[in-house]
């Protein structure tokens, strides 16, 4: 008899999150309001950030952060290609040019030396990615950025709960976290911008809501006139309180959620030892992994089958998988626009990486099921 389908990810939503949404629905104020303010305050306190702005998506957050930094035509922004396409999309939509850099073949994160080689007089920002829950090596990067006077935007979409040398990601500089449905903490769709730069945070807050500088709840609670003034044209990237209410509960549960992920990940590492599936390696510097993803590299020469056959084999056993990610520069638009870009480590991994199930409501029996299925496929 076939076992039930095991997805590669599933949000951990319980009665507390459902009750929090119900409370907002009954309150009479369901869009951006007090729950947003509470979420911003609690998130900033947790990571040690001076400023926090809740937003409707990490893509929207990246868009207006780049805009707030003045990124535009003629500018270059350095980013790994081995990441989700939204980063490069936002750079291009602002008229700037993404400059793709290669990554370490086994952590899938770049480093300061590789990034420095890509800097030109047109470089205006660097976007390091904390990949799969591991922390980027930040100290050399910030030293490099300070030396050249270049802004840093940490892509912390995978890094809720990640620490680097004892400090939470988001404790310095500027970072963007994602609360998408598969992330370690979720509210279906949402994000948090954090920064120690007050002027930048104020501009992001203004740009997120039409460039008004205030939202409807501000006008209600502070008695402002219904029609606030546009300071500069902005967007509609505010987060609804229904989503913020879920995120508040998830934030309180984050340590518990990440601890469960770590138990599962360590069980995977133990049970997969000796198999030719090449999990990502942990960085050698001090960091606390959030275990957002558990990624294997399925190389046909080592495994006896390619990634597509591997994923199909698991699917036939009702086990879901994912690909995180097809390298950005290999997508049709970017391949046509930047045909000269060659990133050997990125391209090797992009053709082989595969995410296997990892979410907090999994059990060790689920891990046993997945690893047993993998062993059978490779036998």
UniProtKB/Swiss-Prot annotation:
Superkingdom per UniProt = Bacteria
Q: What does this protein do?
A: Catalyzes the conversion of UDP-4-keto-arabinose (UDP-Ara4O) to UDP-4-amino-4-deoxy-L-arabinose (UDP-L-Ara4N). The modified arabinose is attached to lipid A and is required for resistance to polymyxin and cationic antimicrobial peptides.
A GO MF label: pyridoxal phosphate binding
Its BP terms in the Gene Ontology are: lipid A biosynthetic process; lipopolysaccharide biosynthetic process; response to antibiotic
Pfam families per UniProt: DegT_DnrJ_EryC1
Record's keyword terms, sorted:
Aminotransferase, Antibiotic resistance, Lipid A biosynthesis, Lipid biosynthesis, Lipid metabolism, Lipopolysaccharide biosynthesis, Pyridoxal phosphate, Transferase
> In the record, which residues are listed under signal peptide?
none
Concerning NCBIfam families, the annotation shows: PRK11658.1
Which chemical reaction does it catalyze? UDP-4-amino-4-deoxy-beta-L-arabinose + 2-oxoglutarate = UDP-beta-L-threo-pentopyranos-4-ulose + L-glutamate
Query: How does the annotation summarize its subunit structure?
Result: Homodimer.
Q: Tell me which cofactor or cofactors this protein depends on.
A: pyridoxal 5'-phosphate
The protein's name is: UDP-4-amino-4-deoxy-L-arabinose--oxoglutarate aminotransferase
| Chain positions with N6-(pyridoxal phosphate)lysine modification | 183
Task: State which Enzyme Commission number(s) the record gives.
Answer: 2.6.1.87
* Pathway entry: Nucleotide-sugar biosynthesis; UDP-4-deoxy-4-formamido-beta-L-arabinose biosynthesis; UDP-4-deoxy-4-formamido-beta-L-arabinose from UDP-alpha-D-glucuronate: step 2/3; Bacterial outer membrane biogenesis; lipopolysaccharide biosynthesis
Family recorded in the similarity comment: Belongs to the DegT/DnrJ/EryC1 family. ArnB subfamily.
């Amino acid at each position: 008899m076939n076992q039930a389908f095991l997805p590669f990810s599933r949000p951990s939503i319980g009665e507390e999150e459902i009750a929090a949404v119900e409370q907002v629905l009954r309150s009479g104020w369901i869009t951006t309001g007090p729950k947003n303010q509470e979420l911003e305050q609690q998130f900033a306190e947790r990571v040690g950030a001076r400023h926090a702005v809740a937003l409707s998506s990490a893509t929207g957050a990246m868009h207006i952060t780049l805009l707030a930094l003045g990124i535009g035509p003629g500018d270059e922004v350095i980013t790994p290609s081995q990441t989700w396409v939204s980063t490069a999309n936002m750079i291009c939509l602002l008229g700037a040019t993404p400059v793709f850099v290669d990554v370490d073949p086994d952590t899938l994160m770049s480093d300061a030396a590789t990034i420095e080689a890509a800097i030109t007089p047109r470089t205006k920002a660097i976007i390091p990615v904390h990949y799969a829950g591991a922390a980027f090596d930040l100290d050399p990067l910030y030293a490099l950025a300070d030396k050249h006077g270049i802004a840093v935007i940490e892509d912390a979409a995978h890094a809720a709960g990640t620490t680097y040398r004892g400090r939470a990601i988001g404790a310095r500089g500027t970072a963007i976290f994602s609360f998408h449905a598969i992330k370690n903490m979720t509210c279906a769709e949402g994000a948090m911008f954090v920064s120690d730069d007050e002027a930048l945070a104020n501009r992001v807050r203004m740009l997120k809501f039409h460039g008004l500088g205030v939202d409807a709840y501000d006008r209600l609670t502070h008695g402002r006139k219904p029609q606030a003034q546009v300071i500069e044209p902005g967007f509609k990237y505010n987060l609804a309180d229904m989503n913020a209410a879920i995120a508040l509960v998830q934030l309180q549960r984050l340590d518990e959620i990440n601890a469960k992920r770590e138990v599962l990940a360590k069980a995977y590492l133990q049970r997969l030892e000796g198999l030719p599936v090449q999990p990502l390696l942990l960085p050698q510097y001090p960091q606390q992994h959030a275990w957002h993803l558990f990624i294997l590299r399925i190389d046909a020469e080592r495994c006896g089958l390619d990634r597509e056959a591997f994923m199909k084999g698991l699917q036939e056993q009702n086990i879901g998988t994912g690909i995180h990610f097809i390298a950005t520069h290999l997508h049709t638009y970017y391949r046509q626009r930047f045909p000269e870009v060659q990133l050997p480590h990125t391209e090797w991994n992009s053709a082989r990486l595969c995410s296997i199930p990892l979410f907090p409501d999994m059990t060790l029996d689920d891990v046993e099921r997945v690893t047993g299925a993998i062993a059978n496929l490779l036998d």
